[in-house]
Amino acid sequence: CVLVLFLCTSGYFLFSEPKIATIQSCEDAAWESDLPTTPGSELIPGTLKLRTGLASIELRSGASFVLEGPAEVELISAMKTRLVAGMVMVEVPEQAIGFVLETPDGYAIDYGTRFAVAVDPIKNVSSFEVIDGEIGVHHPVSGSEVRLVDNQTISIEKGIVSPMKEG
């Protein structure tokens, strides 16, 4: 009986979802989410929908982001997040270089930086802006990658990559 109980509980710990992020703070936040949404909550992979306000989330990798509502983000792993809609400001320390932020239109690989991404699903546009540092923006349909550095922006609209602009 004790062995069965041990096997059942150890199986629970072996197969339970890993905690990949923590909500650091919220400001005037109103949520629609199955995941916990109070500051200090540890998060497993899943989707967060922020109707209004701001939320600061830190991933176990050390990467962190501020989500501005209305927004929807899917936490995939400590090194990968998907912005479905809305705006996010991302900060990636050295230990999290290689962090990936996906959007419906492309994705950014971080090389140690602060950057912002906005997704408008109605207009089918994803915009990327580097505040400080460097990212690579990838367009999966064409297979192209564009490197952005300080104050550069690029957008992908309806599958077309716009030229870089100085911000």
Region locations from a protein language model:
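Flexible, surface-exposed loop/linker segments and immediately adjacent secondary-structure boundaries
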Residues: 2-47, 51-154
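Pro/Ala/Gly-rich low-complexity, hydrophilic intrinsically disordered segments
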Residues: 157-167
